[in-house]
Amino acid sequence: GSLSGRTQLSKGASMVLNGDVVSTGDIVNAGEIYFDNQTTPDAVLSRAVVKGNAPVTFHKLTTSNLTGQGGTINMRVSLDGSNASDQLVINGGQATGKTWLAFTNVGNSNLGVATSGQGIRVVDAQNGATTEEGAFALSRPLQAGAFNYTLNRDSDEDWYLRSENAYRAEVPLYASMLTQAMDYDRILAGSRSHQTSVSGENNSVRLSIQGGHLGHDNNGGIARGATPESSGSYGLVRLEGDLLRTEVAGMSLTTGVYGAAGHSSVDVKDDDGSRAGTVRDDAGSLGGYLNLTHTSSGLWADIVAQGTRHSMKASSDNNDFRARGWGWLGSLETGLPFSITDNLMLEPQLQYTWQGLSLDDGQDNAGYVKFGHGSTQHVRAGFRLGSHNDMTFGEGTSSRDTLRDSTKHRVRELPVNWWVQPSVIRTFSSRGDMSMGTAAAGSNMTFSPSRNGTSLDLQAGLEARVRENITLGVQAGYAHSVSGSSAEGYNGQATLNVTF
């Protein structure tokens, strides 16, 4: 087809090109130009992606001069590595002003592979034609698979679509979901220091409220196989209760169960330090514990098994992606207390933790997202230094008239224990793949961010018996990563322990 003379589209006007079109005059565009009929609802989908397998014939629009007045040219492109697209040809003249290019990815479902060479030529300057530096720009993000595609002007005056060296923001965002879920599970399980433990023969129920900040430093980013940089907060409520306390062959045995509900929200950064998005996780957990304590020596061992249901939502500027899954955790911890003085105790501790995670696969606006089974292991070595009060309530001296003798205690008379717990935590053997791609062969990209690393952890706490059967505990802590991609942050917790 052909266009005779000067063609001018005012704002709000549109023109549909059927086949190759040559304009014998200039084109001035403030409206919309469409290659083929892309205005039908079945042809254009959100986020510049068309699904389907119908063969596509690409076309050219040729003109001597194009003056952009904020108008848009809607073009089709196949992001399957074939470098095929509609083209705008500037023949011997100039492209000036400002023209927006809107691309629709056509062909097989959500094609998306890395471009090769100079990229996909979409504006072809021929016979000495020139194009101003700002003559063209993308009107909307173009994404497929793991890639962002950008519009670039080369020294030959042509304009090309290229996949960025850096992956699209959703790559580190989705990869961080594995890390965030497992970080939360480990925090919830904690160590023995996260319980207010009162010695005695009676069963007890404990209610804990915990919150804190958690993050990962930039250690090279997703492109170098590291956990993406992130920073966020969490909060949880945990209720646990003893089911059985008994003596067996010189050992004190305690078993119980716990349940917890929590939420975490983490901001994730791209490899270049820009914001990738936010991941939110609502989690519900059930667990059980077994404690064995050697009566004469005090040597103890804690065994914990925990399962957590995660409901996660990752939000970026271009996508809202949801995934659900299950996290599993097993922990074995042991310690042996030594009395330094009558009221001071030193207790070396060692803890091993294994974690697993499985998240559901899904799809966002640019392709599929698949998660491999995640797992990681931790070893914590440290010691606990603190007072060694037997927490006997005794008789108080308060002169206040009270209903119960057990409340006749001044604050300074309450039985109190304090403790500090420095540790080194080594995370190793971390696994967990996240794959993104489309139906196109060669589009699949797999990312395996490592969570291996070492951190230093310091916890401190205080517990006071305020009634014969009630103990209150508070604690705070800080973890600092010294190598690799281990987590760091701070936490605080308050615990109410009631025996019966």
Task: List each model region and its residues.
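Outer membrane beta-barrel translocator domains of Type V secretion systems
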Residues: 164-349, 354-356, 360-362, 450, ...
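Alpha-helical protein-protein interaction scaffolds
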Residues: 61-63, 366-370
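Short secondary-structure subsegments characteristic of cysteine-rich extracellular domains
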Residues: 112-130, 223-243, 369-376
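Primarily extracellular Gram-negative trimeric autotransporter adhesin
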Residues: 3, 20-22, 26, 159-179, ...
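Short beta-strand-to-coil "C-cap" segments at the C-terminal boundary of structured domains/repeats
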Residues: 105, 124-126, 162-166, 242, ...
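Outer membrane beta-barrel transmembrane domains
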Residues: 371-500
